[in-house]
Amino acid sequence: MSGKGTKMKSQLGTKKNLLLSLTFVVVALTTLIIGGTVSWSADYATSSVPPTIIVPVDIKPGYCPNPLEVYGSDDVSVAILGTEELDVSEIARDSVRLQEIAPLRSEQRDVAKPFRLYKWQVSGKKLKADYCTDEGPDGKLDLVLYFSKKEILKAVGSTSDGDVLVLRITARNKSGAPIVGQDVVVIQK
Protein backbone atom coordinates (compact mmCIF):
# COMPACT_ATOMS: atom_id res chain seq x y z
CA MET A 1 0.00 0.00 0.00
CA SER A 2 2.80 2.43 0.79
CA GLY A 3 4.25 1.90 -2.73
CA LYS A 4 0.97 3.10 -4.25
CA GLY A 5 0.87 6.10 -1.91
CA THR A 6 4.41 7.12 -2.86
CA LYS A 7 3.62 6.76 -6.56
CA MET A 8 0.42 8.82 -6.12
CA LYS A 9 2.35 11.59 -4.28
CA SER A 10 4.95 11.60 -7.06
CA GLN A 11 2.26 11.95 -9.73
CA LEU A 12 0.54 14.69 -7.73
CA GLY A 13 3.82 16.62 -7.49
CA THR A 14 4.24 16.37 -11.27
CA LYS A 15 0.69 17.64 -11.82
CA LYS A 16 1.31 20.57 -9.46
CA ASN A 17 4.50 21.46 -11.36
CA LEU A 18 2.64 21.31 -14.66
CA LEU A 19 -0.18 23.48 -13.28
CA LEU A 20 2.37 25.99 -11.97
CA SER A 21 4.12 26.09 -15.37
CA LEU A 22 0.83 26.58 -17.23
CA THR A 23 -0.22 29.32 -14.81
CA PHE A 24 3.12 31.08 -15.40
CA VAL A 25 2.65 31.00 -19.20
CA VAL A 26 -0.92 32.36 -18.94
CA VAL A 27 0.19 35.17 -16.61
CA ALA A 28 3.15 36.07 -18.85
CA LEU A 29 1.05 36.13 -22.02
CA THR A 30 -1.75 38.09 -20.33
CA THR A 31 0.80 40.60 -19.08
CA LEU A 32 2.28 40.85 -22.59
CA ILE A 33 -1.14 41.49 -24.13
CA ILE A 34 -2.27 44.05 -21.55
CA GLY A 35 0.96 45.79 -20.65
CA GLY A 36 3.24 45.07 -23.55
CA THR A 37 6.11 43.97 -21.33
CA VAL A 38 6.73 41.35 -18.71
CA SER A 39 8.75 42.39 -15.69
CA TRP A 40 9.89 40.51 -12.63
CA SER A 41 10.87 41.69 -9.18
CA ALA A 42 12.16 38.29 -8.09
CA ASP A 43 15.77 37.88 -7.06
CA TYR A 44 17.47 35.41 -9.43
CA ALA A 45 19.36 33.88 -6.51
CA THR A 46 16.14 32.84 -4.76
CA SER A 47 13.77 32.34 -7.71
CA SER A 48 13.64 29.44 -10.14
CA VAL A 49 11.29 31.30 -12.50
CA PRO A 50 13.27 32.98 -15.31
CA PRO A 51 12.05 36.23 -16.87
CA THR A 52 10.13 36.10 -20.14
CA ILE A 53 12.15 37.16 -23.18
CA ILE A 54 10.26 39.28 -25.72
CA VAL A 55 11.61 38.67 -29.22
CA PRO A 56 11.12 40.32 -32.62
CA VAL A 57 9.10 38.19 -35.06
CA ASP A 58 8.61 38.66 -38.79
CA ILE A 59 5.86 36.73 -40.54
CA LYS A 60 6.62 36.37 -44.25
CA PRO A 61 9.99 38.17 -44.13
CA GLY A 62 10.38 40.69 -46.95
CA TYR A 63 6.69 41.66 -46.96
CA CYS A 64 4.96 44.55 -45.21
CA PRO A 65 2.04 44.32 -44.71
CA ASN A 66 2.23 40.56 -44.21
CA PRO A 67 -0.44 38.91 -46.39
CA LEU A 68 -2.05 35.66 -45.26
CA GLU A 69 -3.89 34.33 -48.29
CA VAL A 70 -6.66 31.85 -47.54
CA TYR A 71 -6.18 30.08 -50.85
CA GLY A 72 -3.31 27.74 -51.72
CA SER A 73 -1.55 25.21 -49.57
CA ASP A 74 1.93 26.68 -49.32
CA ASP A 75 3.72 26.93 -46.00
CA VAL A 76 4.05 30.24 -44.14
CA SER A 77 7.54 31.38 -43.14
CA VAL A 78 7.94 33.02 -39.74
CA ALA A 79 11.27 34.31 -38.44
CA ILE A 80 12.38 34.91 -34.89
CA LEU A 81 14.90 37.65 -35.54
CA GLY A 82 18.34 37.61 -34.00
CA THR A 83 19.53 40.76 -32.22
CA GLU A 84 22.56 41.86 -30.22
CA GLU A 85 20.82 40.39 -27.15
CA LEU A 86 19.26 37.31 -28.81
CA ASP A 87 21.28 34.44 -30.23
CA VAL A 88 18.64 32.36 -32.04
CA SER A 89 20.80 29.23 -31.78
CA GLU A 90 19.91 29.29 -28.05
CA ILE A 91 16.19 28.73 -28.80
CA ALA A 92 14.95 25.17 -28.20
CA ARG A 93 13.43 24.55 -31.63
CA ASP A 94 11.13 21.78 -30.41
CA SER A 95 9.45 24.26 -28.04
CA VAL A 96 8.44 26.81 -30.70
CA ARG A 97 4.71 27.27 -31.36
CA LEU A 98 2.77 29.76 -33.49
CA GLN A 99 -0.81 29.95 -32.21
CA GLU A 100 -0.08 26.58 -30.51
CA ILE A 101 1.05 25.05 -33.86
CA ALA A 102 4.42 23.29 -34.15
CA PRO A 103 6.60 24.21 -37.13
CA LEU A 104 7.04 21.77 -40.00
CA ARG A 105 10.74 22.57 -40.33
CA SER A 106 13.26 25.29 -39.48
CA GLU A 107 16.59 26.74 -40.51
CA GLN A 108 18.96 29.49 -39.45
CA ARG A 109 19.73 32.28 -41.91
CA ASP A 110 19.67 36.06 -41.99
CA VAL A 111 16.36 37.21 -43.49
CA ALA A 112 15.27 40.50 -41.89
CA LYS A 113 15.95 43.42 -39.59
CA PRO A 114 13.58 43.70 -36.59
CA PHE A 115 10.69 46.17 -36.76
CA ARG A 116 11.57 49.07 -34.45
CA LEU A 117 8.37 48.65 -32.40
CA TYR A 118 8.46 44.88 -31.97
CA LYS A 119 7.38 45.23 -28.31
CA TRP A 120 4.17 47.09 -29.27
CA GLN A 121 0.99 46.30 -27.43
CA VAL A 122 -2.45 45.62 -28.88
CA SER A 123 -4.61 46.34 -25.85
CA GLY A 124 -6.95 49.27 -26.44
CA LYS A 125 -5.54 50.13 -29.85
CA LYS A 126 -6.72 49.51 -33.38
CA LEU A 127 -4.41 47.05 -35.08
CA LYS A 128 -2.36 48.47 -37.90
CA ALA A 129 -1.32 46.38 -40.88
CA ASP A 130 1.94 48.31 -41.16
CA TYR A 131 3.31 47.25 -37.75
CA CYS A 132 6.00 45.39 -39.69
CA THR A 133 9.07 45.85 -41.85
CA ASP A 134 10.14 44.79 -45.32
CA GLU A 135 13.80 45.51 -44.63
CA GLY A 136 16.09 42.68 -45.61
CA PRO A 137 19.02 41.04 -43.84
CA ASP A 138 20.87 42.88 -41.08
CA GLY A 139 23.90 40.64 -40.57
CA LYS A 140 22.44 38.65 -37.65
CA LEU A 141 21.25 35.06 -37.89
CA ASP A 142 17.49 34.52 -37.62
CA LEU A 143 15.52 31.35 -36.85
CA VAL A 144 13.21 30.81 -39.83
CA LEU A 145 10.33 28.42 -39.20
CA TYR A 146 7.77 27.08 -41.65
CA PHE A 147 4.16 26.45 -40.59
CA SER A 148 1.17 24.87 -42.32
CA LYS A 149 -1.07 27.64 -43.65
CA LYS A 150 -4.05 25.33 -43.27
CA GLU A 151 -3.30 24.85 -39.55
CA ILE A 152 -2.82 28.60 -39.01
CA LEU A 153 -6.15 29.40 -40.66
CA LYS A 154 -7.87 26.74 -38.54
CA ALA A 155 -6.32 28.22 -35.38
CA VAL A 156 -7.43 31.82 -36.11
CA GLY A 157 -10.98 30.78 -36.99
CA SER A 158 -13.49 32.76 -39.03
CA THR A 159 -12.06 35.80 -40.83
CA SER A 160 -13.03 38.36 -43.45
CA ASP A 161 -11.01 39.82 -46.29
CA GLY A 162 -8.78 42.61 -44.96
CA ASP A 163 -8.88 41.53 -41.31
CA VAL A 164 -5.68 42.42 -39.44
CA LEU A 165 -4.72 39.75 -36.91
CA VAL A 166 -1.93 39.31 -34.38
CA LEU A 167 -0.19 35.93 -34.43
CA ARG A 168 1.89 34.99 -31.40
CA ILE A 169 4.95 32.81 -31.06
CA THR A 170 5.92 31.08 -27.84
CA ALA A 171 9.07 29.09 -27.15
CA ARG A 172 11.77 28.45 -24.56
CA ASN A 173 15.48 28.96 -24.73
CA LYS A 174 17.84 26.10 -23.93
CA SER A 175 18.04 27.33 -20.32
CA GLY A 176 14.24 27.06 -19.99
CA ALA A 177 13.35 30.77 -20.05
CA PRO A 178 10.03 31.48 -21.80
CA ILE A 179 10.10 33.40 -25.08
CA VAL A 180 7.19 35.31 -26.64
CA GLY A 181 6.81 37.43 -29.76
CA GLN A 182 4.15 38.60 -32.19
CA ASP A 183 3.53 40.02 -35.64
CA VAL A 184 0.51 41.07 -37.68
CA VAL A 185 -0.99 39.53 -40.82
CA VAL A 186 -3.65 40.79 -43.22
CA ILE A 187 -6.20 38.22 -44.38
CA GLN A 188 -6.56 38.05 -48.16
CA LYS A 189 -9.53 36.18 -49.61
Role assignments for model-derived ranges:
Residues 1-16:
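N-terminal secretory signal peptides that target proteins for export/translocation
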Residues 63-66, 80-88:
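Short amphipathic, basic-aromatic surface patches that mediate peripheral association
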Residues 82, 96, 169-171:
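Residue-level detector of buried hydrophobic side-chain packing
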Residues 158-188:
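Ser/Thr/Pro-rich, low-complexity mucin-like regions
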